[in-house]
């Protein structure tokens, strides 16, 4: 079940948004890292 009291707290929304943003940035960095390595692999 969803705890609606947690969703009413704006700080929790900020935490969720930050987590999603960090996860997206990390995924992008990983993709770029392996993409460059694949192209310039020796």
Curated annotation (Swiss-Prot):
The chain crosses the membrane at residues 11-31. It is a single-pass membrane protein. The keyword tRNA-binding does not apply. One of its GO terms (cellular component) is virion membrane. It is found in: Virion membrane. The keyword Membrane applies. Keywords: Capsid inner membrane protein, Membrane, Transmembrane, Transmembrane helix, Viral genome packaging, Viral release from host cell, Virion. Coiled coil: none annotated. Together with P22, forms the internal part of the portal complex embeded in the virion internal membrane and which plays critical roles in genome packaging and genome ejection. Both proteins multimerize as a single ring-shaped heterdodecamer arranged around a central channel and interact with the P6/P9 external part of the portal. Heterodimer of P20 and P22; further multimerizes as hexamers of heterodimers. Part of the dodecameric portal complex that is composed of the packaging efficiency factor P6, the DNA packaging ATPase P9, and the internal heterododecamer P20/P22 which spans the virion inner membrane. This is Packaging protein P20. The gene is XX.
């Amino acid at each position: 079940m969803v705890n609606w009291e947690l969703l009413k707290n704006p700080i929790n929304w900020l935490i969720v948004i930050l987590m999603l943003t960090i996860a997206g940035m990390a995924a992008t960095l990983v993709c770029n890292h392996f993409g460059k390595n694949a192209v310039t692999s020796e």
